[in-house]
Amino acid sequence: MEYKIVIEKPAMKFLKKQQQGNRDRIIKAIQGLPGIGDIKPMAGHVSLYRLRVGDFRVLYTLENELLVVRVVNIGSRGDVYK
């Protein structure tokens, strides 16, 4: 089963601002979702997960019944959780 990846507007905006090397590395990590990488569920959230890509964090939700990974935000380690 292959998941469809949906990148929300705030995450896409962050990606567009990044240098090509960082952007490629983040996109490659996102393509491995939902099961590959340094992934942890976010405390206090039912279906929100965190993927670590170097100094960046990718926050996403899983919609297993629809086979959708929804990337809701991407940011630097200190800023993405705010």
PLM features: residue spans?
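Enriched for short, Lys/Arg-rich terminal
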Residues: M1-V6, K13-K16, G21-D24, V53-F56, ...
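A short, surface-exposed loop/turn module that caps and links secondary-structure elements
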Residues: K28-L51
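Short histidine/acidic/glycine/proline-rich micro-motifs that form metal-
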Residues: M12-K13, L48
